[in-house]
């Protein structure tokens, strides 16, 4: 009986030792799982296209076009399942009001309002409204257009969040919003000339600000691009780094050495 108990006890010790030795080395299955996880991490985090979502967005865009045929000019769904509705400038308030109040839409949150400047177009400015529906967890993009002189109706009465957005578009692009309660610059300083986000705005601007120690205040002056005289050696384009050039043969000769004669 004692011998049998001793054999069982020895087997237990050997099994525990084998488990201890194996604990330090990952099993084949664990190595396979780690390789799969490493391969999955390298995949691009791009949302896959859903045919069901694409069809639903297309159907909703066609529905909006049927309800507002006077204003909706184009409906399109991008490859990433993003619905875009292009409307006439006169239909900004009716379209956004419909999208906010309709039961099947409820786009009550204005996520962003911006503009794009395309100087080659007749109506160079593209106004973009990004709307969010918390009820249906959906987004929609409404686009319209304008030029330098034609104003766009303000949507502050529809979305109060558009107040500062429209001020920013006016400041950066110069698009005027009609019936805005307080349309003034929001990012640039008082008396700023021009609109920085226009494609024809110079990179240096028109004026520069500096502190004048004589008058003890900040003064605005026309931009002066003063540059010191620089001499360029254009003999060889490969000698841009003189410190790394090969030293001439005369510098290699020590004092008293004679230059070897060439045959």
UniProtKB/Swiss-Prot annotation:
The keyword Oxidoreductase is annotated on this UniProt entry: yes
Subunit structure as annotated in this protein's UniProt entry: Core subunit of respiratory chain NADH dehydrogenase (Complex I) which is composed of 45 different subunits. Interacts with NDUFAF3. Interacts with RAB5IF. Found in subcomplexes containing subunits NDUFS2, MT-ND1 and NDUFA13.
EC number in record: 7.1.1.2
GO molecular function: NADH dehydrogenase (ubiquinone) activity; NADH dehydrogenase activity
Keywords (A to Z) from UniProt: Electron transport, Membrane, Mitochondrion, Mitochondrion inner membrane, NAD, Oxidoreductase, Respiratory chain, Transit peptide, Translocase, Transport, Ubiquinone
Membrane topology: Peripheral membrane protein
HAMAP family: NDH1_NuoC (MF_01357)
UniProt-listed GO biological process terms: aerobic respiration; mitochondrial electron transport, NADH to ubiquinone; mitochondrial respiratory chain complex I assembly; proton motive force-driven mitochondrial ATP synthesis; reactive oxygen species metabolic process
Gene Ontology annotations for the cellular component aspect, listed alphabetically: mitochondrial inner membrane; mitochondrial membrane; mitochondrion; myelin sheath; nuclear body; respiratory chain complex I
Role description: Core subunit of the mitochondrial membrane respiratory chain NADH dehydrogenase (Complex I) which catalyzes electron transfer from NADH through the respiratory chain, using ubiquinone as an electron acceptor. Essential for the catalytic activity and assembly of complex I.
InterPro entries (UniProt xref): NADH_DH_suC, NADH_quin_OxRdtase_su_C/D-like, NADH_UbQ_OxRdtase_30kDa_su, NADH_UbQ_OxRdtase_CS
Keyword Metal-binding carried by entry: no
Pfam families: Complex1_30kDa
Presequence extent in this chain: 1-35
Record's catalysed reaction(s): a ubiquinone + NADH + 5 H(+)(in) = a ubiquinol + NAD(+) + 4 H(+)(out)
Major place of residence: mitochondrion
Gene knockout outcome: Conditional knockout (KO) in the forebrain neurons results in reduced complex I activity, altered brain energy metabolism, increased locomotor activity with impaired motor coordination, balance and stereotyped behavior, neuroinflammation in cortex and hippocampus, and neuronal death in hippocampus. Conditional KO in skeletal muscle results in development of a progressive myopathy resulting in premature death, muscle degeneration accompanied by increased mitochondrial proliferation and serum lactic acidosis and a decrease in complex I activity, assembly and expression in muscle.
Subcellular localization(s) per the UniProt record: Mitochondrion inner membrane
Organism of derivation: Mus musculus
Name listed for the protein in its UniProt record: NADH dehydrogenase [ubiquinone] iron-sulfur protein 3, mitochondrial
Family in the record: Belongs to the complex I 30 kDa subunit family.
